[in-house]
Amino acid sequence: MPLSRLIINNFRNLQSLDLELSPNFNFIVGHNGSGKTSLLEAIFYLGHGRSFKSHISNRIIHYQAEDFVLHARIDEGQHQWSVGIQKKRSGDTLLKINGEDGNKISDLAHLLPMQVITPEGLTLLNGGPTFRRAFLDWGLFHQYTEFYSCWANLKRLLKQRNAALHQVRSYAELKPWDTELAKLAEIVSQMRANYAEALRPEIEKTCQFFLPELEIGVSFHQGWEKGTDYAEILAQGFERDKAMGYTMIGPQKADFRFRANGLPVEDVLSRGQLKLLMCVLRLAQGEYLVAQKERQCLFLIDDFASELDPIKRELLAHRLRESGSQVFVTAITKDQLNQMQWQESEQDSLFQVQQGMLTK
């Protein structure tokens, strides 16, 4: 679902922008601090209700304003959506889809599936399991309509159980939570396992194309020993969990691990190889969504040039072009875009950003 128009007001240093966008490639050029990454951040915020750079909303609102407003038009064939989000310094958030209030962030996220490739994205590979669970759960959110409610209820029950661990004296008092928690944990973990298994050949095939010198393997770990009953694990671990004050084992500990030639990728790959692998994983997942759901996936790419050799950059640019996806790419200069092997076409758009102002 490509964005055809984007309006930004008071988002970081972007005070007032109105962009007509290409459904193909949108190149955003500007020096460091000009606002080009903020433009990507604004698009990300529209699709997630949060920033990929800061969790403090007041840092995102322009220093002279009391709120920021983002508005976009989404086109898909004969269908069109108008979406908007307003965030105030007070913390209040207003969402609108086609002019109607009462929507949730998940409704916006459903309309705007997007993959983000930034220098910070290496945490997918060298960070903790939290980042890899988020990777899996992104795919599940867009793949299965029932996943989000199961996942949200699971988080709620885990939070309630952890609070109850500080209050109960015996396991009998906790068992009502555990009965429902165990059922949801099994459902969510099975969905994760099924999705991971379906995505695995796509990842391995795409890795073979970009990294033929390496044998990349992936494996899913559900967060407790496979083949064991989670309800029994909760019961057996009650005293330990009560002493620690939180639930130590379960789907909140799940992981999706990547290995190169049998070893953890973070131990054997160079930063350039890790950067390429991260790009490949995002690309494979986005392409899988398109193939399964016949929905377009947006790609937001910041600082693409760093740590990738020219051949790999050209391969990735060509693959993204072939995908038919809407892509947003930042660069410091237009010459840098040429060095990155991005080839402009007549359908592409090039934007120059300078001190929060933009020209096309």
From Swiss-Prot:
Pfam families to which the protein is assigned, alphabetical: SMC_N (PF02463)
SUPFAM superfamilies attached to this UniProt entry: P-loop containing nucleoside triphosphate hydrolases
Keyword terms, alphabetized: ATP-binding, Cytoplasm, DNA damage, DNA repair, DNA replication, DNA-binding, Nucleotide-binding, SOS response
Membrane-spanning parts: none
InterPro entries: DNA-binding_RecF, DNA-binding_RecF_CS, P-loop_NTPase, RecF/RecN/SMC_N, RecF_2
Major place of residence: cytoplasm
GO molecular function, one term: single-stranded DNA binding
UniProt: ATP binding residues: 30-37
Compartments, as annotated in UniProt: Cytoplasm
Superkingdom of origin: Bacteria
GO annotation, biological process: DNA replication; DNA synthesis involved in DNA repair; double-strand break repair; SOS response
Cellular component terms per the entry's GO annotation: cytoplasm
Chain's role: The RecF protein is involved in DNA metabolism; it is required for DNA replication and normal SOS inducibility. RecF binds preferentially to single-stranded, linear DNA. It also seems to bind ATP.
Membership in a protein family: Belongs to the RecF family.
Name of the featured protein: DNA replication and repair protein RecF
